[in-house]
Every structure is written in structure tokens, then in C-alpha cells.
Amino acid sequence: MSRHLISTLAIPLFSLLTLSFAAQAQAQQPIRPPIATTQVEGTDNVYIFRNGGHQAMFVVTSDGVIATDPVAYGKPTGGQDYLNEIRKLTDKPIRYLVYSHHHFDHIAGGKVFKDAGAKVLAHRIAKARLERLNDPHTVLPDEAWAMRVV
């Protein structure tokens, strides 16, 4: 084969292969992480919420719900899945939402809980870090505590 023929065929073949791979990649939708809630063995009111590889816990008390870490895979409205799972078990008010720390994967769903009436709590260091980050999508804690672990 001549060089001219090879180069003439190579460009369209390369383009066809590239378009084929691009179309295939675009056709594959991201897999939604599995959502599950399980009761902690030996308890009547403590639950673990799982959102893919993340988990949080909540406690249903006689006065309402205390939830932790609104894991939401980085979407400000992603906490709705967590709230929906709580609502499958109780219609009691969400009293408190506790951030374990300031990482976005653990706090991204805070707005949904705040809108549901929760008071948001965190350690004072987490609150200070969230204030410094100044992310408009982040719900800042209403209250912070200073606890020392010895």
C-alpha cells in the first residue's frame, strides 16, 4: 500500500474509533450509589443510613430525631435521600443535625435538614473551618461546642 493510501484511510478510521468510544462513554450513565437504612442491633431507636460508601447515623427519641453527617455525594440537595429514609421510619421532627467534621462529603446535605427545622451543631473547630471556607452551599452550624478529648 502506498503511504498516501494509508494516511488517507488512517484519518477517517481514527476519527470513527474516537467517535465510537466517545459515544459509548456518553451512553453509560453514572451508577447511583445504593441507599440503605438499617437498625443497629440491640437498639430500638438507632439507625445507620448508607449512601454508597458513606454512612451516617440517626437516633429517634421521644422528642424527635438527632441525625449526623448529611452525606450527599457533594450535592446540596443530596441530603433529601437521607431525610426520606428517616421519614420512612418516623414523622417526628428533626431536632438536631450534628456535623462530625468540616469535610464537604459529610456536610453537603445540611440544607435539607435545616429547612426541615433542625438545629445544626458542630465542634468549634469545624465551625471555624466552615466559616473560613465561606461556601454559599454550606449550612453553617447554629451552635458549636468546645470539647477536649484527653
Language-model-detected regions and their locations in the chain:
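Short glycine- and acidic-rich boundary segments immediately preceding or forming the N-terminal edge
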Residues: 29-32
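Boundary at the C-terminal end of the N-terminal hydrophobic targeting segment
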Residues: 22-27
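Positively charged n-region of N-terminal signal peptides that target proteins for export
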Residues: 1-5
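Active-site HxH/HxHxD metal-binding segment of metal-dependent hydrolases
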Residues: 37, 84-149
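Short, solvent-exposed loop/turn segments at the edges of secondary structure
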Residues: 15, 52-54, 115, 140
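Conserved beta-strand hairpin/beta-sheet module of binuclear metal-dependent hydrolase folds
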Residues: 36-86
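Bacterial N-terminal signal peptides
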Residues: 8-20
